[in-house]
Amino acid sequence: MSTNSNQNSIHTPIPEFPENRSTNRSELAAAFEPPDDDVEYSETAPLYSSARASIEGEEAFYQHLSTPDPGNDSGHVRSSNDRIPSTSSNHADGHHVDSVFSNLSAKPTVESNTEELEEEPPSYEQAAADTAPPYWDTTMVIPDYGSNEIYIDGMSVGTGFSFVWSACVAILFPFVGFLVTYVLSTTHLGRYGAQIGLSLTLFQRGYIMISESGMENNDDQYNYDELPHQKLIGSILIIIGWCLVLVDTFGFIRIRRMKNAISRTDSPGETSPEEVV
């Protein structure tokens, strides 16, 4: 009750001309009033401030109509037909916004630029005169290891000594020697020698497992549970070893034939396609 009394004390009395319009205006003002008295009207209650400005303009206009014209001797009071609509005049003068619903009809104004420049592509002479920007090129510099070296697939062929050396190291140091020689070798024959050493190591391990499977244990009893599995694993190792030997042998022969074919191309004689393959 105290809030409503404070809010009603803010408004000035509205003349009863016309009655229905004053009643509607008072209800509209009550609808847009802020909930508290200490709220700033201009910032936190824009709807209330715009409605209040519109109501005050209406009240001033009604008071102007009800007062007699001093230039009129008959004391005639102006009627409502003599007034000018305040909404259009206020909008034309730009004093205040009539209501919140007037923003619905507002449209953004787009400034038309009549001096827009039409961009056109350059002519052929201008495009031809324009120099191309520089581009970075990647140049690979391969050191010269000698005129006798032949490279196949980016790696030199190698010699027979590297082949035998890699195979011996892979056999003397099983698995570890293969990894060292295969990773550190920079020639085709060196890597094939490491693979040959690995295949011979697998063949040797498989043969030992098969031979030990038929021997008696220390307690003079056969371990029948492990015999079939040990023979199977040994057989698989022997098969893998033989396959690696065949693959490495064919690879070694192919590299040697390619080396011979490339070396013959330096001579005046022609080589047949069969020799290259």
Swiss-Prot record:
The lineage of its organism: Eukaryota, Fungi, Dikarya, Ascomycota, Taphrinomycotina. One of its GO terms (biological process) is response to endoplasmic reticulum stress. Residues 1-11, 82-91 have a biased composition (Polar residues). The keyword Transmembrane applies. InterPro entries: NEDD4/Bsd2. Required for homeostasis of heavy metal ions such as cadmium, cobalt and copper. Belongs to the BSD2 family. It is found in: Endoplasmic reticulum; Vacuole; Membrane. This is Probable metal homeostasis protein bsd1. It is a multi-pass membrane protein. Residues 113-122 have a biased composition (Acidic residues). Residues 1-130 are annotated as: Disordered. Its main location: endoplasmic reticulum. It holds the Pfam family NEDD4_Bsd2. The chain crosses the membrane at residues 160-180, 233-253. GO terms for cellular component: endoplasmic reticulum; endoplasmic reticulum membrane; Golgi apparatus; perinuclear region of cytoplasm; vacuole. It comes from the Eukaryota.
